[in-house]
């Protein structure tokens, strides 16, 4: 944590030093210098890059997703019996992604809110766009080309819904190659709502609102299940029915700023308790979900899973030196987590019930997924992120010049 905070404040400190060097060459009164110090303060360079174990957890999550789609590699009775349980490990993987997203985004927003007293919404949305849109729309364009050539089955409604990040609310959504975008839709819809709420409500009220939503979310799911039967197949795919999973991560980020809460939760993280959570997450929850479906997931299943993953996330962040933490922070594991977004996007054309490319060999399929994801990361994601950083730096320099001109 300390390393993360030092890195997050190093850029502002450097910019502040540069500002002081500029100001020191100009004769000014004490009042004027004080005014300049306020006006010229650069934007904080915020990052969550060095939070330990998160990339490793992303890697575990994407492994669960790929494994849940790999039922075709099994044969006969093994395939029929294992598919139902493995399918829910894909749900588990996505749930971990949701909790991590809520935690990371809130952590980033809180650091800006604490540093500047506000949240630059335009800046936040631009940064999210550079992070998410390039790889997503390249994948969507690729599917569009294949669809026009008759190589994949797709509908116009599903394609438009994916393009507008509303696939998860389109009741007639179809087509395997876009069947995984529902989780990306939830995250994008969440990104639109949560920063606005946090800016309006502030940290304390925002936490209270998040907890209230978590408490009423099971009721919302039950009502949706009972009174919107056409959307029952999307019960776990809509923002209003899964927002509590993201909010568990948000609440953890806010509460982690309270030393007394951190101390209490650290005491709770006893090996026996953590072992029980792992048994529940990896064994009990998938079996109950497979056995009872929405009757378990809607009133209690998603809530228990989100809460359990949040505590395990807290443990992984707080104890990176533990055996689990050391594994999660191994370079190959972390790298898989870094490219997990591209893996998630492109695995759909190689893996699952209707893959575009069916190799018949699981090892070759995994290799193709990794090679495609690496290409997507280095050719699409990294250049977009470099461009985003250059624009950030240019914006910072422009802001500094404008503020100096005010003097």
Where are these regions (language model features)?
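Alpha-helical transmembrane segments of multi-pass membrane proteins
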Residues: 122, 126-139, 198
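Function-critical hydrophobic alpha-helical transmembrane segments in multi-pass membrane proteins
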Residues: 174-198
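Residues within membrane-spanning alpha-helices of integral membrane proteins
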Residues: 55, 59-62, 101, 133-140, ...
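Hydrophobic alpha-helical transmembrane segments
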Residues: 133, 192, 207-212, 303-304, ...
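Alpha-helical transmembrane segments in multi-pass integral membrane proteins
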Residues: 11-12, 23, 27, 35-53, ...
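Extracytosolic (periplasmic/ER-lumenal) interhelical loops and adjacent juxtamembrane/interface segments
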Residues: 157-174
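Central hydrophobic cores of alpha-helical transmembrane segments in multi-pass inner-membrane proteins
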Residues: 98-108
């Amino acid at each position: 944590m300390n390393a993360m905070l030092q890195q997050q404040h190093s850029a502002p400190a450097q910019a502040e030093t540069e500002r002081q060097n500029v100001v020191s060459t100009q004769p000014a009164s004490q009042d004027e210098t004080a005014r300049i110090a306020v006006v010229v303060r650069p934007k904080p360079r915020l990052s969550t890059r060095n939070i330990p174990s998160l990339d490793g957890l992303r890697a575990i999550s994407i492994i669960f997703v790929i494994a849940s789609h790999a039922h075709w590699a099994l044969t006969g009775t093994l395939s029929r019996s294992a598919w139902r349980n493995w399918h829910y490990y894909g749900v588990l993987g996505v749930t971990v992604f949701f909790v991590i997203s809520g935690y990371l985004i809130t952590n980033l927003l809180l650091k800006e809110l604490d540093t500047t007293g506000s949240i630059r919404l335009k800046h936040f949305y631009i940064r999210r766009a550079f992070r998410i849109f390039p790889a997503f729309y390249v994948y969507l364009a690729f599917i569009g080309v294949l669809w026009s050539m008759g190589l994949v089955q797709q509908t116009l409604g599903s394609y438009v819904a994916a393009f507008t990040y509303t696939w998860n609310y389109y009741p007639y959504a179809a087509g395997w190659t876009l069947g995984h975008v529902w989780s990306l839709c939830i995250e994008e819809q969440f990104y639109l709502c949560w920063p606005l709420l946090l800016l309006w409500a502030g940290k304390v009220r925002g936490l209270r609102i998040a907890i209230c939503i978590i408490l009423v979310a099971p009721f919302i799911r039950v009502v949706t299940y009972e009174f919107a039967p056409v959307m029952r197949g999307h019960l776990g795919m809509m923002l209003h029915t899964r927002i509590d999973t993201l909010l568990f991560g948000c609440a953890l980020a806010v509460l982690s700023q309270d030393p007394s809460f951190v101390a209490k939760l650290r005491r709770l993280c006893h090996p026996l308790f953590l072992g029980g959570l792992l048994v529940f997450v990896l064994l009990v929850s998938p079996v109950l979900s497979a056995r009872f479906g929405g009757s378990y997931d809607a009133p209690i299943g998603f809530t228990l899973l989100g809460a359990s993953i949040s505590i395990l996330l807290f443990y992984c962040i707080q104890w990176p030196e533990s055996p689990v933490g050391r594994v999660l922070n191994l370079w190959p594991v972390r790298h898989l987590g870094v490219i997990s977004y591209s893996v998630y996007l492109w695995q759909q054309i190689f893996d699952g019930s209707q893959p575009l490319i069916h190799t018949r060999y699981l090892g070759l399929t995994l290799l193709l997924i990794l090679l495609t994801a690496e290409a997507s990361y280095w050719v699409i994601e990294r250049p977009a992120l470099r461009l985003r950083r250059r624009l950030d730096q240019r914006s910072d320099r422009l802001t500094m010049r404008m503020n100096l001109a005010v003097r």
